[in-house]
Protein backbone atom coordinates (compact mmCIF):
# COMPACT_ATOMS: atom_id res chain seq x y z
CA UNK A 1 0.00 0.00 0.00
CA UNK A 2 1.15 3.53 -0.75
CA UNK A 3 0.43 6.92 0.79
CA UNK A 4 0.51 9.07 -2.35
CA UNK A 5 -0.72 8.42 -5.88
CA UNK A 6 1.71 8.18 -8.75
CA UNK A 7 1.07 11.12 -11.12
CA UNK A 8 2.55 9.06 -13.95
CA UNK A 9 -0.43 6.71 -13.67
CA UNK A 10 -2.53 9.33 -15.49
CA UNK A 11 -2.31 8.63 -19.26
CA UNK A 12 -0.41 11.43 -20.97
CA UNK A 13 1.53 10.06 -23.93
CA UNK A 14 1.04 10.62 -27.68
CA UNK A 15 -2.02 8.37 -27.75
CA UNK A 16 -3.98 10.79 -25.54
CA UNK A 17 -3.75 13.61 -28.11
CA UNK A 18 -4.81 13.96 -31.71
CA UNK A 19 -3.94 12.61 -34.20
CA UNK A 20 -2.39 9.91 -31.99
CA UNK A 21 -5.72 9.04 -30.38
CA UNK A 22 -7.42 8.49 -33.75
CA UNK A 23 -4.51 6.42 -35.04
CA UNK A 24 -4.52 4.23 -31.94
CA UNK A 25 -8.29 3.71 -32.14
CA UNK A 26 -7.94 2.57 -35.76
CA UNK A 27 -5.18 0.17 -34.74
CA UNK A 28 -7.38 -1.10 -31.92
CA UNK A 29 -10.11 -2.33 -34.29
CA UNK A 30 -8.21 -5.31 -35.75
CA UNK A 31 -6.60 -5.83 -32.35
CA UNK A 32 -9.98 -6.27 -30.68
CA UNK A 33 -11.26 -8.50 -33.48
CA UNK A 34 -8.23 -10.80 -33.20
CA UNK A 35 -8.52 -10.96 -29.42
CA UNK A 36 -12.25 -11.66 -29.62
CA UNK A 37 -11.69 -14.53 -32.04
CA UNK A 38 -8.83 -15.91 -29.94
CA UNK A 39 -10.76 -15.82 -26.67
CA UNK A 40 -13.94 -17.12 -28.28
CA UNK A 41 -12.03 -20.24 -29.30
CA UNK A 42 -9.90 -20.52 -26.17
CA UNK A 43 -12.80 -20.31 -23.74
CA UNK A 44 -14.65 -23.19 -25.35
CA UNK A 45 -12.58 -25.28 -22.98
CA UNK A 46 -13.56 -24.50 -19.38
CA UNK A 47 -10.11 -25.28 -17.87
CA UNK A 48 -8.69 -22.42 -19.96
CA UNK A 49 -11.11 -19.81 -18.67
CA UNK A 50 -9.87 -17.31 -16.04
CA UNK A 51 -12.31 -18.92 -13.61
CA UNK A 52 -13.30 -22.50 -14.30
CA UNK A 53 -16.70 -21.90 -12.67
CA UNK A 54 -17.63 -19.31 -15.28
CA UNK A 55 -19.84 -20.05 -18.23
CA UNK A 56 -18.48 -19.48 -21.72
CA UNK A 57 -20.41 -16.20 -21.99
CA UNK A 58 -19.19 -14.93 -18.62
CA UNK A 59 -15.55 -15.63 -19.46
CA UNK A 60 -15.71 -14.07 -22.92
CA UNK A 61 -17.68 -11.00 -21.85
CA UNK A 62 -15.38 -10.32 -18.90
CA UNK A 63 -12.28 -10.53 -21.08
CA UNK A 64 -13.76 -8.25 -23.74
CA UNK A 65 -14.69 -5.67 -21.11
CA UNK A 66 -11.15 -5.85 -19.78
CA UNK A 67 -9.79 -5.30 -23.30
CA UNK A 68 -12.08 -2.31 -23.81
CA UNK A 69 -10.88 -0.74 -20.56
CA UNK A 70 -7.27 -1.23 -21.61
CA UNK A 71 -7.90 0.75 -24.80
CA UNK A 72 -9.82 3.43 -22.89
CA UNK A 73 -6.86 3.79 -20.55
CA UNK A 74 -4.32 3.86 -23.37
CA UNK A 75 -6.03 6.81 -25.06
CA UNK A 76 -6.78 8.48 -21.72
CA UNK A 77 -10.48 8.84 -22.49
CA UNK A 78 -12.45 10.77 -19.90
CA UNK A 79 -16.00 12.07 -19.96
CA UNK A 80 -17.27 15.65 -20.02
CA UNK A 81 -20.62 16.52 -18.48
CA UNK A 82 -23.49 18.78 -19.42
CA UNK A 83 -26.27 20.23 -17.30
CA UNK A 84 -28.72 20.09 -20.21
CA UNK A 85 -31.56 17.61 -19.80
CA UNK A 86 -31.20 16.18 -23.29
CA UNK A 87 -32.95 12.84 -23.74
CA UNK A 88 -33.38 12.51 -19.96
CA UNK A 89 -36.36 14.85 -20.26
CA UNK A 90 -38.46 15.61 -17.20
CA UNK A 91 -36.60 13.07 -15.07
CA UNK A 92 -33.72 15.59 -14.97
CA UNK A 93 -33.27 18.32 -12.37
CA UNK A 94 -30.55 20.84 -11.62
CA UNK A 95 -29.58 21.76 -8.07
CA UNK A 96 -27.92 24.86 -6.71
CA UNK A 97 -25.23 24.37 -4.05
CA UNK A 98 -26.26 24.88 -0.45
CA UNK A 99 -24.98 27.59 1.90
CA UNK A 100 -21.19 27.70 2.09
CA UNK A 101 -21.33 26.66 5.74
CA UNK A 102 -22.68 23.23 4.73
CA UNK A 103 -19.30 22.33 3.24
CA UNK A 104 -16.78 22.15 6.04
CA UNK A 105 -13.51 20.55 7.01
CA UNK A 106 -11.99 18.57 4.14
CA UNK A 107 -14.97 19.38 1.90
CA UNK A 108 -14.84 23.15 2.35
CA UNK A 109 -14.29 25.43 -0.62
CA UNK A 110 -10.70 26.09 -1.58
CA UNK A 111 -8.99 28.07 -4.31
CA UNK A 112 -9.27 25.15 -6.73
CA UNK A 113 -12.62 23.50 -5.93
CA UNK A 114 -15.89 25.08 -4.85
CA UNK A 115 -19.44 23.69 -4.61
CA UNK A 116 -21.19 24.15 -7.93
CA UNK A 117 -24.48 23.55 -9.69
CA UNK A 118 -25.07 19.86 -10.40
CA UNK A 119 -27.74 17.85 -12.16
CA UNK A 120 -29.34 14.52 -11.46
CA UNK A 121 -31.83 11.98 -12.73
CA UNK A 122 -34.93 10.71 -10.93
CA UNK A 123 -36.26 7.19 -11.45
CA UNK A 124 -39.07 6.74 -12.31
CA UNK A 125 -40.00 10.43 -11.92
CA UNK A 126 -39.45 13.54 -9.84
CA UNK A 127 -41.34 13.48 -6.51
CA UNK A 128 -43.61 16.38 -5.60
CA UNK A 129 -42.04 19.27 -3.75
CA UNK A 130 -43.49 20.56 -0.45
CA UNK A 131 -45.16 23.40 -2.37
CA UNK A 132 -46.87 20.89 -4.63
CA UNK A 133 -48.21 18.86 -1.72
CA UNK A 134 -51.36 20.10 -0.09
CA UNK A 135 -50.00 20.00 3.46
CA UNK A 136 -46.47 21.16 2.60
CA UNK A 137 -44.66 18.40 4.46
CA UNK A 138 -43.18 14.97 3.82
CA UNK A 139 -46.46 13.09 3.86
CA UNK A 140 -46.31 10.43 1.18
CA UNK A 141 -49.04 8.00 2.14
CA UNK A 142 -46.83 4.93 1.95
CA UNK A 143 -43.64 6.57 3.28
CA UNK A 144 -41.79 4.76 0.51
CA UNK A 145 -38.03 4.58 0.20
CA UNK A 146 -35.99 7.26 -1.57
CA UNK A 147 -32.58 6.11 -2.77
CA UNK A 148 -29.70 8.55 -3.17
CA UNK A 149 -27.41 6.57 -5.44
CA UNK A 150 -23.89 7.38 -6.63
CA UNK A 151 -22.75 5.71 -9.83
CA UNK A 152 -19.41 4.02 -10.45
CA UNK A 153 -16.78 5.02 -13.01
CA UNK A 154 -13.53 5.69 -11.09
CA UNK A 155 -14.52 9.39 -10.89
CA UNK A 156 -13.70 9.51 -14.62
CA UNK A 157 -16.85 8.34 -16.39
CA UNK A 158 -20.65 7.92 -16.29
CA UNK A 159 -23.44 10.29 -15.44
CA UNK A 160 -26.25 8.51 -13.59
CA UNK A 161 -28.49 9.09 -16.62
CA UNK A 162 -30.59 6.32 -18.19
CA UNK A 163 -28.02 5.45 -20.84
CA UNK A 164 -25.48 4.27 -18.25
CA UNK A 165 -27.44 3.80 -15.02
CA UNK A 166 -31.09 3.31 -15.95
CA UNK A 167 -31.12 -0.49 -15.75
CA UNK A 168 -29.42 -0.54 -12.34
CA UNK A 169 -31.73 2.22 -11.06
CA UNK A 170 -34.82 0.29 -12.10
CA UNK A 171 -33.45 -2.92 -10.57
CA UNK A 172 -32.73 -1.08 -7.31
CA UNK A 173 -36.20 0.46 -7.17
CA UNK A 174 -37.84 -2.89 -7.79
CA UNK A 175 -35.75 -4.60 -5.11
CA UNK A 176 -36.61 -2.00 -2.45
CA UNK A 177 -40.34 -2.24 -2.89
CA UNK A 178 -43.35 -0.50 -4.44
CA UNK A 179 -43.22 3.26 -4.61
CA UNK A 180 -39.43 3.47 -4.35
CA UNK A 181 -37.84 6.40 -6.11
CA UNK A 182 -34.14 6.89 -6.66
CA UNK A 183 -32.11 10.00 -7.38
CA UNK A 184 -28.79 9.65 -9.20
CA UNK A 185 -26.70 12.82 -8.97
CA UNK A 186 -24.47 13.63 -11.88
CA UNK A 187 -21.56 14.46 -9.61
CA UNK A 188 -18.56 16.23 -11.08
CA UNK A 189 -15.94 14.00 -12.64
CA UNK A 190 -12.30 14.65 -11.85
CA UNK A 191 -11.37 13.80 -15.43
CA UNK A 192 -13.74 16.37 -16.95
CA UNK A 193 -11.50 18.64 -19.01
CA UNK A 194 -14.19 21.34 -19.14
CA UNK A 195 -14.62 21.84 -15.40
CA UNK A 196 -11.22 20.61 -14.14
CA UNK A 197 -13.02 19.66 -10.93
CA UNK A 198 -10.70 17.78 -8.60
CA UNK A 199 -11.04 16.42 -5.10
CA UNK A 200 -13.26 16.98 -3.13
CA UNK A 201 -15.78 17.99 -5.82
CA UNK A 202 -17.67 14.65 -5.88
CA UNK A 203 -18.04 14.75 -2.09
CA UNK A 204 -19.26 18.35 -2.18
CA UNK A 205 -21.85 17.28 -4.74
CA UNK A 206 -23.00 14.47 -2.44
CA UNK A 207 -23.68 17.04 0.29
CA UNK A 208 -25.56 19.21 -2.22
CA UNK A 209 -27.71 16.24 -3.27
CA UNK A 210 -28.50 15.19 0.31
CA UNK A 211 -29.52 18.72 1.31
CA UNK A 212 -31.70 18.89 -1.81
CA UNK A 213 -33.59 15.78 -0.70
CA UNK A 214 -33.95 16.73 2.96
CA UNK A 215 -34.33 20.50 2.83
CA UNK A 216 -35.69 21.33 -0.62
CA UNK A 217 -37.99 18.33 -1.04
CA UNK A 218 -38.71 17.79 2.65
CA UNK A 219 -37.96 14.06 2.51
CA UNK A 220 -37.40 12.50 5.91
CA UNK A 221 -33.89 11.02 6.30
CA UNK A 222 -35.61 7.94 7.77
CA UNK A 223 -36.81 7.25 4.23
CA UNK A 224 -33.44 7.83 2.57
CA UNK A 225 -31.20 4.95 1.56
CA UNK A 226 -27.70 5.84 0.39
CA UNK A 227 -26.27 3.57 -2.30
CA UNK A 228 -23.09 3.46 -4.30
CA UNK A 229 -21.13 1.06 -6.41
CA UNK A 230 -17.35 1.08 -6.76
CA UNK A 231 -16.20 4.73 -6.57
CA UNK A 232 -19.80 5.71 -5.89
CA UNK A 233 -19.59 3.74 -2.66
CA UNK A 234 -16.56 5.82 -1.70
CA UNK A 235 -18.80 8.88 -1.93
CA UNK A 236 -21.68 7.24 -0.06
CA UNK A 237 -19.58 6.19 2.94
CA UNK A 238 -17.78 9.56 2.92
CA UNK A 239 -21.19 11.23 3.23
CA UNK A 240 -22.11 8.98 6.17
CA UNK A 241 -18.85 9.84 7.94
CA UNK A 242 -19.21 13.54 7.18
CA UNK A 243 -22.82 13.82 8.34
CA UNK A 244 -22.02 11.96 11.55
CA UNK A 245 -19.12 14.29 12.28
CA UNK A 246 -21.25 17.30 11.35
CA UNK A 247 -23.96 16.40 13.83
CA UNK A 248 -21.37 15.82 16.56
CA UNK A 249 -19.70 19.20 16.06
CA UNK A 250 -22.81 21.26 15.35
CA UNK A 251 -24.33 23.42 18.06
CA UNK A 252 -26.41 26.60 18.13
CA UNK A 253 -23.42 28.47 19.55
CA UNK A 254 -21.17 27.85 16.54
CA UNK A 255 -23.87 28.45 13.94
CA UNK A 256 -23.50 31.64 11.93
CA UNK A 257 -27.21 32.04 11.31
CA UNK A 258 -30.32 30.04 12.08
CA UNK A 259 -30.49 28.57 8.56
CA UNK A 260 -26.84 27.59 8.92
CA UNK A 261 -27.65 25.66 12.08
CA UNK A 262 -30.43 23.78 10.30
CA UNK A 263 -28.01 22.69 7.60
CA UNK A 264 -25.41 21.69 10.14
CA UNK A 265 -27.87 19.36 11.85
CA UNK A 266 -28.81 17.23 8.88
CA UNK A 267 -30.09 13.91 10.24
CA UNK A 268 -28.39 10.75 9.10
CA UNK A 269 -29.95 8.48 6.46
CA UNK A 270 -31.57 5.14 7.12
CA UNK A 271 -29.00 2.79 5.62
CA UNK A 272 -25.99 2.76 3.28
CA UNK A 273 -25.70 0.10 0.56
CA UNK A 274 -22.26 -0.44 -0.99
CA UNK A 275 -21.58 -2.68 -3.96
CA UNK A 276 -18.00 -3.62 -4.84
CA UNK A 277 -16.94 -0.53 -2.89
CA UNK A 278 -13.63 1.23 -3.36
CA UNK A 279 -12.73 1.67 0.30
CA UNK A 280 -8.95 1.51 0.14
CA UNK A 281 -7.40 3.81 -2.44
CA UNK A 282 -3.96 3.34 -0.93
CA UNK A 283 -4.33 -0.23 -2.25
CA UNK A 284 -5.87 0.69 -5.60
CA UNK A 285 -3.10 3.18 -6.28
CA UNK A 286 -0.41 0.54 -5.70
CA UNK A 287 0.05 -1.26 -9.03
CA UNK A 288 2.48 -3.80 -7.62
CA UNK A 289 0.01 -4.80 -4.89
CA UNK A 290 -2.79 -5.21 -7.42
CA UNK A 291 -0.60 -7.35 -9.68
CA UNK A 292 0.09 -9.64 -6.72
CA UNK A 293 -3.60 -9.92 -5.85
CA UNK A 294 -5.06 -13.41 -6.00
CA UNK A 295 -7.90 -12.17 -8.23
CA UNK A 296 -5.80 -10.16 -10.64
CA UNK A 297 -6.52 -12.52 -13.54
CA UNK A 298 -10.25 -12.90 -12.93
CA UNK A 299 -11.20 -9.23 -12.64
CA UNK A 300 -11.75 -6.99 -15.65
CA UNK A 301 -10.27 -3.98 -13.82
CA UNK A 302 -6.49 -4.11 -14.17
CA UNK A 303 -3.72 -2.52 -12.11
CA UNK A 304 -2.94 0.46 -14.40
CA UNK A 305 -6.63 1.37 -14.60
CA UNK A 306 -7.02 1.32 -10.83
CA UNK A 307 -3.86 3.40 -10.41
CA UNK A 308 -5.21 5.95 -12.89
CA UNK A 309 -8.45 6.31 -10.94
CA UNK A 310 -6.53 6.73 -7.70
CA UNK A 311 -4.23 9.38 -9.19
CA UNK A 312 -7.18 11.24 -10.71
CA UNK A 313 -9.15 11.59 -7.47
CA UNK A 314 -6.11 12.05 -5.22
CA UNK A 315 -3.37 14.18 -6.81
CA UNK A 316 -0.42 13.91 -4.40
CA UNK A 317 -0.17 17.67 -4.01
CA UNK A 318 -3.75 17.86 -2.65
CA UNK A 319 -4.65 14.70 -0.73
CA UNK A 320 -3.15 11.41 0.45
CA UNK A 321 -4.48 8.06 -0.68
CA UNK A 322 -4.78 6.96 2.94
CA UNK A 323 -7.07 9.89 3.75
CA UNK A 324 -10.01 8.69 5.91
CA UNK A 325 -12.50 9.69 3.21
CA UNK A 326 -10.63 7.84 0.43
CA UNK A 327 -9.46 4.80 2.38
CA UNK A 328 -12.24 4.42 4.97
CA UNK A 329 -11.42 0.71 5.30
CA UNK A 330 -8.46 1.80 7.44
CA UNK A 331 -10.50 4.17 9.63
CA UNK A 332 -13.64 2.45 10.93
CA UNK A 333 -16.03 4.72 12.80
CA UNK A 334 -19.17 4.32 14.86
CA UNK A 335 -22.39 5.09 13.04
CA UNK A 336 -26.10 4.49 13.62
CA UNK A 337 -26.48 4.01 9.86
CA UNK A 338 -26.76 0.32 8.97
CA UNK A 339 -24.15 -0.72 6.41
CA UNK A 340 -24.54 -3.34 3.68
CA UNK A 341 -21.33 -4.28 1.90
CA UNK A 342 -21.19 -6.56 -1.16
CA UNK A 343 -18.20 -7.85 -3.10
CA UNK A 344 -17.52 -10.37 -5.82
CA UNK A 345 -15.44 -13.40 -4.96
CA UNK A 346 -13.40 -12.99 -8.16
CA UNK A 347 -12.70 -9.26 -7.92
CA UNK A 348 -9.46 -7.63 -6.86
CA UNK A 349 -11.19 -5.72 -4.06
CA UNK A 350 -12.72 -8.84 -2.51
CA UNK A 351 -10.30 -9.17 0.42
CA UNK A 352 -10.21 -5.40 0.99
CA UNK A 353 -14.00 -5.25 1.20
CA UNK A 354 -14.16 -8.24 3.53
CA UNK A 355 -11.55 -6.67 5.81
CA UNK A 356 -13.43 -3.37 5.86
CA UNK A 357 -16.68 -5.11 6.78
CA UNK A 358 -14.97 -6.93 9.64
CA UNK A 359 -13.42 -3.73 11.00
CA UNK A 360 -16.68 -1.80 10.89
CA UNK A 361 -18.58 -4.69 12.44
CA UNK A 362 -16.08 -4.72 15.32
CA UNK A 363 -17.03 -1.14 16.29
CA UNK A 364 -19.58 -1.33 19.15
CA UNK A 365 -23.07 -0.41 18.03
CA UNK A 366 -22.45 -0.76 14.29
CA UNK A 367 -24.78 -2.91 12.20
CA UNK A 368 -22.92 -4.36 9.21
CA UNK A 369 -23.97 -7.02 6.74
CA UNK A 370 -21.40 -8.43 4.32
CA UNK A 371 -22.31 -10.41 1.21
CA UNK A 372 -19.68 -12.07 -0.98
CA UNK A 373 -21.00 -13.33 -4.31
CA UNK A 374 -18.86 -16.30 -5.38
CA UNK A 375 -16.92 -16.22 -8.66
CA UNK A 376 -18.06 -12.75 -9.74
CA UNK A 377 -15.81 -9.85 -10.79
CA UNK A 378 -16.05 -6.18 -9.88
CA UNK A 379 -19.36 -4.33 -9.87
CA UNK A 380 -21.27 -7.27 -11.27
CA UNK A 381 -24.65 -5.55 -10.95
CA UNK A 382 -23.70 -2.69 -13.23
CA UNK A 383 -21.97 -4.81 -15.85
CA UNK A 384 -24.41 -7.73 -15.93
CA UNK A 385 -21.75 -10.42 -16.17
CA UNK A 386 -23.74 -12.90 -14.12
CA UNK A 387 -25.56 -15.71 -15.93
Residues covered by each model-derived region:
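Extended, polar/charged low-complexity intrinsically disordered and coiled-coil segments in eukaryotic
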Residues: 1-142, 281, 308-311, 340, ...
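Conserved alpha/beta-hydrolase
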Residues: 172-192
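Alpha/beta-hydrolase active-site loop signature
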Residues: 154, 187-191, 279, 377
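Alpha/beta-hydrolase active-site loop
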Residues: 196-217, 238
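Short, surface-exposed "cap/lid" segments of acyl-processing enzymes
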Residues: 119-176
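Fold-level signal for large, globular catalytic cores of enzyme and receptor domains
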Residues: 149, 177, 193, 212-219, ...
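Alpha/beta hydrolase fold serine-hydrolase catalytic domain that processes acyl esters and thioesters
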Residues: 17, 21-24, 204, 218-225, ...
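Gly/Ala-rich beta-loop-alpha elbow adjacent to hydrolase catalytic centers
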Residues: 228, 232, 236
